[in-house]
Amino acid sequence: MKFTPSIVIDAPQYYVDHFNGKYNVDKCVILRDLQLETDSESMPSSLKHLTKPTHILDLTNNDLIMIPDLSRRDDIHTLLLGRNNIVEVDGRLLPMNVQNLTLSNNSIRRFEDLQRLRRAPRTLKNLTLIGNQVCHLANYREHVLRLVPHLETLDFQNVTAEERKSAMSFPRQADGDTLGPVNTAIRDNGSRDKTMEIMNLVVSKMTVERRNELKKQLAEATSLEEIARLEKLLSGGV
C-alpha cells in the first residue's frame, strides 16, 4: 500500500509518559501494520502531513525497504521501524534529534549495509538491530560502535568502556569498512528465505486468540524492551 496524505492525517495518536515520566508529554503517531511501501513520490509528500509535534513515530510491521526521509523533523526523538524489509541504513534520513531507533527484524545482512549509519545525528543514543542477519557477524557490536561511537545502548545492552576502546582500535579497510572475519553461513543467499520459512510456520500455528492477545499487550506496552519482546513473539520468535 502506498502512503497517502489521508493515511498520515488519520493515523491514531496517543500520549505516553514512559520516556521521561511526565504525563501527556510525548505524542505517538501509529502507522503500523498497514503494509506501507517505500515510494519516492507519495511517501515524502504524504509524510509532510505528519502532525507536529510528533515525538514517537511507529512504522512497525510494514513493507518499507528504506528509512523514510525525516531529516527535517526536529521533534521526533523515537523512530520505530521494526519488522519491515529495510536493507540499508542511511543516517542522513533520520530525524535531526533522534534518540531512539528500532530496526529489529529487517533485512540488514552485511556491515556494508550499515556504513551510512555513521551519518546519524549525534543525538542517537539507543539503537536496536536484533533480528537482522548482520547481528550474527563476527565483531558486530564493535563495528556498530565504530560507526556510531556516541551510542549508549545497543540491542538493549549498555555500551561498556571496553567495547568503545575495542571499537576504536579496529583497523580499517581502504573503503572505510572495519576488518573482521565474517560468518560465511550467514552470507548464504538462501539463509534469509529459510528464516522466513520457519517464521511463517511458527506464526501460522499461533491461534487467533493468542495473536490478538499479543497485539493488545503490544498496544499497552510501556517500554522499548517490552515492545521488542512482543514484536518478536508476533513474528514467530526468530
UniProtKB/Swiss-Prot annotation:
UniProt key word Nucleus: yes
Domain LRRCT: 132-170
LRR repeats: 53-74, 75-95, 97-118
Alphabetized GO MF terms: U2 snRNA binding
BP GO annotations: mRNA splicing, via spliceosome; U2-type prespliceosome assembly
One GO CC annotation: nucleus
Keywords recorded for this protein, A-Z: Leucine-rich repeat, mRNA processing, mRNA splicing, Nucleus, Repeat, Spliceosome
Physiological role: Involved in pre-mRNA splicing. Associates to U2 snRNA in a MSL1 dependent manner and is required for normal accumulation of U2 snRNA. Required for the spliceosome assembly and the efficient addition of U2 snRNP onto the pre-mRNA.
Protein's name according to its UniProt entry: U2 small nuclear ribonucleoprotein A'
Organism: Saccharomyces cerevisiae (strain ATCC 204508 / S288c)
